[in-house]
Each structure stands twice: as structure tokens, then as C-alpha cells.
């Protein structure tokens, strides 16, 4: 995956940096694995706005991605690498030996025609999904389950990876992209390798219109609002707004939002980096 810059022939081209899409091999998704996505525009079932700065954007269809990788022992061939508008990573279409088709998150370095496996007997190679107890210590992994059979919950966005650092009894110690070090049950599955499209973080839309195509509306600062609209609004002339707060009045910078008595805290060995 690489990125492409443009000559500044227009203001919108000047700062535009987008992916080259050179790894994409198909432009039309598998029809049996998609369904329509209804745009809410940030409104709930009563028509009331519950999330600001959303609305518009290009029409999308949801690709059904397999995060469980529960077809153990059945080989699958990578048929295509595709673009998914609903996530930063690319997706890969697998054709299983029994005829079933599934999408997975495409790891870095995955090629069309490669054969993938999942289960305890799978080799620790890129794209294969194994229980953590069968993965060698030091291996780079992604798509990690928090509970056995639940499906991947951690490390799913473009370019991310975690590392299996050690084993302690029935748990494995994982270092996550945030810097957090935590224990996860050894029977949980993970996929070998890092998530593809690693240059996604270098991309720049270049203009406001590209954000609107993606369904993002302009975001106003709280200090330019009226007091009725935001805790930081109002004041004579240009005011600082006082202590940074969210729209609901919570401190916006430095306040810990994690519940102090959360059950899973006992599995965290080292908190994430700031």
C-alpha cells in the first residue's frame, strides 16, 4: 500500500493525499455477503438528533466480515482483495473448500491465490487464525478475541498490530497498539500478521467536500457557541471558555472515563500510554 500526492493545480488538490488502491483486485463486492445500510443522519427512532456532525455522504452497503474464523480445518483460497467503505482496512474474499464464501480483514502481505487455515492445527503464517496457546511467543497478531468464540474485538483497524509477549498459566500476555499490556485467555483466537493498508494514517482529504462524501458534517467549537448550547460558550468578546468541557459538562482533557470498578481491570498489567 502506498499513497499518492497531487500537483497543486487547485486548492483541493494541494493537500490531497490518498491511497493508490494498487492492491485492490475487484470493484464489485460478493452479492451474497452484502446488505443495504440505512443512513440515520445522527437521529434516533423519534427523529431527534443524538449525534451531531453526521449526515449525507455516499450510499454504502455493509460487507459481512467474518471475525470468528470458526471454520477450523477447512482450507480457503484468497479470491480477491477489496475496498470496504465502512472501515480503514481492506477486506479479502475467501473461497472455502466446501463452497462457502466469507470476507476477512486483509492482513499486510496477503496475496490473491494464497491458502489460509484456521484452528489449532493451522501453521502460524500470515492470515491464519489460531488460538493464542498455539501461537509462538513474540509473534505479531491482530483480530484478537476477548472471549472464546465471541469474534475478534481488538486490533482491527488499518496498520495496527499487537504482540504476544508471554504466557502465564491459562492466560497469554498481549501488548496492544495503545501500549496497554493485558492478559487474555489462551483459548481465544487471533490472526497472524498485522492489518493491511498501513499507510492509511498518511492520507489527507485535501478539501471539505471529501469529508462530506464520507458523511461528516462541519464540527463547531464549543467556545464559539452561546451558553445555551455549550458549557464553554458565551462571554464578552473572545473568551477562553474556562476549563475544557464536553457538551454534557464533563471535563474534556485528562478526565479518566474508565469505570473504577470494571471487572476486566484485573487483567490489565500495564495501562495504555497517554
Curated annotation (Swiss-Prot):
GO biological process, one term: cytoplasmic translation
InterPro entries recorded: NA-bd_OB-fold, Rib_uL2_dom2, Ribosomal_uL2, Ribosomal_uL2_bac/org-type, Ribosomal_uL2_C, Ribosomal_uL2_CS, Ribosomal_uL2_dom3, Ribosomal_uL2_RNA-bd_dom
GO molecular function, one term: structural constituent of ribosome
Example of a GO cellular component annotation carried by this entry: large ribosomal subunit
Keyword Mitochondrion part of the UniProt annotation: no
Signal peptide: none
Comp. bias (Basic residues): 209-220, 244-264
Pfam families recorded: Ribosomal_L2, Ribosomal_L2_C
The keyword Cell membrane is assigned to this record: no
Keywords for the protein's UniProt record, in alphabetical order: Ribonucleoprotein, Ribosomal protein, RNA-binding, rRNA-binding
UniProt superkingdom: Bacteria
Segments of this protein annotated with the region Disordered: 195-274
Subunit structure: Part of the 50S ribosomal subunit. Forms a bridge to the 30S subunit in the 70S ribosome.
PANTHER family, alphabetized: LARGE RIBOSOMAL SUBUNIT PROTEIN UL2M, RIBOSOMAL PROTEIN L2
Family per record: Belongs to the universal ribosomal protein uL2 family.
Function: One of the primary rRNA binding proteins. Required for association of the 30S and 50S subunits to form the 70S ribosome, for tRNA binding and peptide bond formation. It has been suggested to have peptidyltransferase activity; this is somewhat controversial. Makes several contacts with the 16S rRNA in the 70S ribosome.
Name the UniProt record assigns to this protein: Large ribosomal subunit protein uL2
Species of origin: Bacteroides fragilis (strain ATCC 25285 / DSM 2151 / CCUG 4856 / JCM 11019 / LMG 10263 / NCTC 9343 / Onslow / VPI 2553 / EN-2)
Lineage: Bacteria, Pseudomonadati, Bacteroidota, Bacteroidia, Bacteroidales
Amino acid at each position: 500500500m502506498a499513497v499518492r500526492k497531487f500537483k497543486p493545480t487547485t486548492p483541493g488538490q494541494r493537500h490531497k493525499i490518498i491511497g493508490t488502491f494498487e492492491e485492490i483486485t475487484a470493484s464489485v463486492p460478493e452479492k451474497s455477503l452484502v446488505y443495504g445500510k440505512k443512513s440515520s443522519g445522527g437521529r434516533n427512532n423519534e427523529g431527534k438528533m443524538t449525534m451531531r456532525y453526521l449526515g449525507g455522504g455516499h450510499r454504502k452497503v455493509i460487507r459481512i466480515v467474518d471475525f470468528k474464523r470458526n471454520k477450523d480445518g477447512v482450507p480457503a483460497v484468497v479470491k480477491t482483495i477489496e475496498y470496504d467503505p465502512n472501515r480503514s482496512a481492506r477486506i479479502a474474499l475467501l473461497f472455502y473448500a466446501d463452497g462457502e464464501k466469507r470476507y476477512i480483514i486483509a492482513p499486510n502481505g496477503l496475496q490473491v491465490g494464497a491458502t489460509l487455515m484456521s484452528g489449532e492445527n493451522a501453521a502460524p503464517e500470515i492470515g491464519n487464525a489460531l488460538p493464542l496457546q498455539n501461537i509462538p511467543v513474540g509473534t505479531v497478531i491482530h483480530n484478537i478475541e476477548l472471549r472464546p468464540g465471541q469474534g475478534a474485538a481488538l486490533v482491527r483497524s488499518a496498520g495496527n498490530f499487537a504482540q504476544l509477549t508471554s504466557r502465564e498459566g491459562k492466560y497469554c500476555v498481549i501488548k496492544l497498539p495503545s501500549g496497554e499490556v493485558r492478559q487474555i485467555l489462551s483459548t481465544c483466537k487471533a490472526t497472524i500478521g498485522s492489518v493491511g493498508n498501513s499507510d492509511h494514517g498518511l492520507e489527507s482529504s485535501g478539501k471539505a467536500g471529501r469529508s462530506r462524501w464520507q458523511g461528516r458534517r462541519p464540527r463547531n467549537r464549543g467556545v464559539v457557541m452561546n451558553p445555551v448550547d455549550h458549557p464553554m460558550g458565551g462571554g464578552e468578546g473572545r473568551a477562553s471558555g474556562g476549563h475544557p468541557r464536553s457538551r454534557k459538562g464533563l471535563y474534556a482533557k485528562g478526565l479518566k472515563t474508565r469505570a473504577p470498578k470494571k471487572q476486566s481491570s484485573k487483567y490489565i498489567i500495564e495501562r495504555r500510554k497517554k
